Amino acid sequence: MEKILAINAGSSTLKWQLFEMPSETVIAKGMIDRLGLSDSVFTAKYGDNQKFKEVQDVTTHEMAATLLLTRLKELGIVSHLDEITGVGHRVVGGGEAFSDSMVINPVALDEINRLAEYAPLHNPTQAYYIKIFTALLPGVPQVAVFDTSFYSTLAPENYLYSIPQEYYQKYGARKYGAHGTSHRYVAHRAAEILETPLESQKMITLHLGSGASITAVQDGHAVDTSMGFTPLAGITMGTRSGDIDASLVAFLAKKLEITMPEMIDILNQKSGLLGISELSPDMRDLEETADTRPQSALALSIFVNRVVKYVGSYVALMNGIDTLVFTAGSGENGSELRADICKQLACFGVKLDEEKNNVRSQERIISADDSKVKVLIVPTNEELMIARDVMRLK
């Protein structure tokens, strides 16, 4: 038995899970929230439903990593740190340099830092944690698991933009996608549930959370995805606009007398469901107020509309569909949302079982027995995918 630590680091949070492998048992999990502030919160769940929480100053990433390893020992989750035989790190941007997860060496770490211009909010922090854990756990393999590597199989006609090709050749201006680790996990898990090889299925996976993306999977690999050069592209999201005419971006920046970075910030932080509803980016708030607020109902309709358009285009791209998979917050818990989406996909043979659909975040098949397309709920588990990659590569 081996213990693998999965790290999902952001600028102000450090999420973690410790797995016993190869049984894939979660030994402990938790997070450090509000990093960089005087009231940072460390939480852990472990053992027989034991919980631990403390508030203290965690002002640097070094302090966060040290605190995590210290608490793992003090809480008796591990007796010695040398029980940890591998650490896996989520890294958002792998560009074209990384087509698979990788055991990190100094050259690879430099490349992750070089790719920071493609994921400026994530790569620098995630690369720094790799460096920190390498120092704190000497000799323990550090594996980077890239959000983008699942999309290394896209064909040029699906990842290139219709712009002068020198911009792609010089600057890497192309679709990279995001949420790849989530889509990869749910695609493989859905195939296991159906007891049908992924390689023989035409599958569409819907990651519908505050950030939302759709991926088409054929012959066992991704063939297209809704997010683009950045996670701003694709369907309407909680606060992100999704696809938008580039000329409108310049037009609004001029009208508002703001800079382009300020305009992009509006598209990332103040648009999507929040922008349309003028109330909330949370699907639950919109569903609760849809009967009394036309803007809430409109936001929900636009979201469903964008999802259906992408699914329809991917069905055409693959010349059919066998399996539709819902995951992430709204995808796992939104029975009404799933019903609204599937109702508009009836032309493809999608039919839900109403009773099976009325569950929250439980892994199951929810399509009717006579549905031509299998529809599933598969709660995502990026950390487990990370742990599996560590075991495969270390």
Give the residues covered by each predicted segment.
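Phosphate/pyrophosphate-binding loops at sites that engage ATP/ADP/AMP, CoA/4′-phosphopantetheine
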Residues: 71-85, 190-197, 311-322
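Glycine-rich phosphate-binding loop of actin/hexokinase-like ATP-binding domains
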Residues: 152-253
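Short glycine-rich, Thr/Ser-proximal phosphate-binding strand/loop in the N-terminal lobe
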Residues: 4, 13-58, 228
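Short beta-strand-loop/turn "lid" adjacent to the catalytic site in phosphate-handling enzymes
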Residues: 72-121, 143, 149-158
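Glycine-rich beta-strand-to-loop/alpha-helix junction loops that act as flexible
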Residues: 9-10, 89-93, 208, 325-333
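Catalytic phosphate/nucleotide-handling subdomain of diverse soluble enzymes
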Residues: 218, 224-256, 265, 328-359
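Adenine-nucleotide phosphate-binding core of ATP-dependent small-molecule kinases
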Residues: 265, 272-276, 283-317
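Internal helix-turn-beta structural module
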Residues: 297, 301-317, 321-322, 331-394
